[in-house]
Curated annotation (Swiss-Prot):
Promotes the survival of neuronal populations that are all located either in the central nervous system or directly connected to it. Residues 1-5 form the signal peptide. This is Neurotrophic factor BDNF precursor form. Glycans are attached at residue 107. Keywords: Cleavage on pair of basic residues, Disulfide bond, Glycoprotein, Growth factor, Secreted, Signal. GO terms for molecular function: growth factor activity; nerve growth factor receptor binding. GO terms for biological process: cell surface receptor protein tyrosine kinase signaling pathway; modulation of chemical synaptic transmission; negative regulation of neuron apoptotic process; nerve development; nerve growth factor signaling pathway; neuron projection morphogenesis. InterPro entries: Brain-der_neurotrophic_factor (IPR020430), Cystine-knot_cytokine (IPR029034), Nerve_growth_factor-like (IPR020408), Nerve_growth_factor-rel (IPR002072), Nerve_growth_factor_CS (IPR019846). Disulfide bonds join 127-194, 172-223. One of its GO terms (cellular component) is extracellular space.
Amino acid sequence: SCMKAAPMKEVSIRGQGSLAYPGLRTQGNLETLSGPNDATRGLTSLADTFEHVIEELLDEQQVIQPSKENKDADLYSTRVMLSSQVPLEPPLLFLLEEYKNYLDAANMSMRVRRHSDPARRGELSVCDSTSEWVTAAEKKTAVDMSGATVTVLEKVPVPKGQLKQYFYETKCSSKGYAKEGCRGIDKRYWNSQCRTTQSFVRALTMDNKKRVGWRFIRIDTSC
């Protein structure tokens, strides 16, 4: 986060047909197209297909409701994952949530929103950030909603064994503008600094009285 921050426009390094949201793949490739006009139609078709898939997934996410039998359904967080190995990609629901927030804020038609994507206009973020999966073994401890320090358990028992807890954390990049100030701020008149901010997610933890349970803890979620 950054006070008095404003984006600075620069030349885009993305192609006009690039998709800004990984994790979903559309069918078709541009090598089978015969000419410039066909290539343009192909890019439009791929973008439309991508939008259609996104809309379907968002609709399905709204329809799905946790059943009464699944009492742990509400413990799930988009930035927490239980897995036997390190996840290879960002969580899909996290990507959908980020995209949905952008759509809600834009309040435009899908086609207009696509062309107003900051990645297409060549805009850069005020602060650079990096995201990665972090294990409970790396976190070890965290602060819960009451301000107490709790131990983050590395493994979660499941019917067929144990799974590890992984947290998808986002923090300010150590390179670039993190130390020099926020991008787009006139240094002659303003002092600025990019800082990592935190949010609460639910995780399996143990307090100082050895009581194990699901609690909200703070993790790094933005810059």
